[in-house]
UniProtKB/Swiss-Prot annotation:
It is found in: Golgi apparatus membrane; Cytoplasmic vesicle membrane; Cytoplasm; Cell projection, Axon. Pathway: Cofactor biosynthesis; NAD(+) biosynthesis; NAD(+) from nicotinamide D-ribonucleotide: step 1/1; Cofactor biosynthesis; NAD(+) biosynthesis; deamido-NAD(+) from nicotinate D-ribonucleotide: step 1/1. ATP binds at residues 24, 271-274. Divalent metal cations. Mg(2+) confers the highest activity. This is Nicotinamide/nicotinic acid mononucleotide adenylyltransferase 2. Inhibited by P1-(adenosine-5')-P3-(nicotinamide-riboside-5')-triphosphate (Np3AD) and P1-(adenosine-5')-P4-(nicotinamide-riboside-5')-tetraphosphate (Np4AD). PANTHER family: NICOTINAMIDE MONONUCLEOTIDE ADENYLYLTRANSFERASE, NICOTINAMIDE_NICOTINIC ACID MONONUCLEOTIDE ADENYLYLTRANSFERASE 2. It catalyses: beta-nicotinamide D-ribonucleotide + ATP + H(+) = diphosphate + NAD(+); nicotinate beta-D-ribonucleotide + ATP + H(+) = deamido-NAD(+) + diphosphate. Degraded in response to injured neurite. Degradation is caused by polyubiquitination by MYCBP2 after recognition by FBXO45. Palmitoylated; palmitoylation is required for membrane association. Changing residue 172 to A: Impaired membrane association in neurons. GO terms for cellular component: axon; cytoplasmic vesicle membrane; cytosol; extrinsic component of membrane; Golgi apparatus; Golgi membrane; late endosome; synapse. Gene3D superfamilies: HUPs. Its main location: Golgi.
Length: 307
């Protein structure tokens, strides 16, 4: 497959990130490597979206701290970004609404085709009037040819950085003006862009808990967007999926990363990290990056059992 015929993917991870661990970052890296090896996908970006403060989880530190820790954790990555949108809303947002927000935002700022899992490739280009004999539209009439794949990916990458990139320390993070003029308007007919939910097997397993998830949301998350699962602790993902009628229904939309099931980062968790911090356990350096540890110590986070 050529670059233009492969599905271009943005991986979106929602969660507490309380704190963000090396395991979270490795989850992105492992998912990207796996998708690339299939030959069907090109991962062009990753988004870390920390949950709103009103989520109500015991021991959840302020989103201000979590956003800064997340940014410190990805500061050396050239493709993973932190997005504060979820934290800045008036109240907690569902995973479904976060996915829909990013899909709609990327439609507006890139002009790319953003499709659902089952959308055929003839999907109309969002944001362009559909008329017979429609020609590519440019603000600069001197542009002689349609944009190349490289130009398109550059535009998407630029937009993704503007949307997601936040830098501590600031009182309030700045992200993209959704009404901003991003320059040349092009019809990106060649590129199909999809946002996939990235998660661990623990989140996948939570879909099987009766009443925990809204079934309509599950239909959208799994049926429309799709999921990339990075198993933890050698979890049996086939067994998990067989326990949910919706997961069984959309099994083909769930991609399980099958690499090293004994990957050392697969046992790392935020809970283990907090416990290590509370007990002064030196193994915390195996769980968290040094900039995150330094920030935690400086801010005196997670120093007692309540979080």
């Amino acid at each position: 497959m050529t670059e233009t015929t492969k599905t271009h993917v943005i991986l979106l991870a929602c969660g507490s990130f309380n704190p963000i661990t090396k395991g979270h970052i490795q989850m992105f890296e492992r998912a990207r490597d796996y998708l690339h090896k299939t030959g069907r996908f090109i991962v062009i970006g990753g988004i870390v979206s920390p949950v709103h403060d009103s989520y109500g989880k015991q021991g959840l530190v302020s989103s201000r701290h979590r956003l800064i820790m997340c940014q410190l954790a990805v500061q050396n990555s050239d493709w993973i970004r932190v997005d504060p949108w979820e934290c800045y809303q008036d109240t907690w947002q569902t995973t479904c609404s976060v996915l829909e927000h990013h899909r709609d935002l990327m439609k507006r700022v890139t002009g790319c085709i953003l499709s659902n899992v089952n959308t055929p490739s003839m999907t109309p280009v969002i944001g362009q009037p559909q008329h017979e004999n429609t020609q590519p539209i440019y603000q600069n009439s001197n542009v002689p040819t349609k944009p190349t794949a490289a130009k398109i990916l550059g535009k998407v990458g630029e937009s993704l950085s503007r949307i997601c990139c936040v830098r501590p320390p600031v009182e309030r993070f700045t992200f993209v003006d959704e009404n901003a003029n991003l320059g040349t308007v092009m019809r990106y007919e060649e590129i199909e862009l999809r946002i996939l939910l990235l998660c661990g097997s623990d989140l996948l397993e939570s879909f099987c808990i009766p009443g925990l998830w809204n079934e309509a949301d599950m239909e959208v998350i799994v049926g429309d967007f799709g999921i990339v699962v990075v198993p933890r602790d050698a979890a049996d993902t086939d067994r998990i999926m067989n326990h949910s009628s919706i997961l069984r229904k959309y099994k083909n939309n769930i991609m399980v990363v099958k690499d090293d099931i004994n990957h050392p980062m697969s046992v790392v968790s935020s809970t283990k990290s907090r416990l290590a911090l509370q007990h002064g356990d030196g193994h915390v350096v195996d769980y968290l990056s040094q900039p995150v540890i330094d920030y935690i110590l400086k801010s005196q986070l997670y120093i007692n059992a309540s979080g």
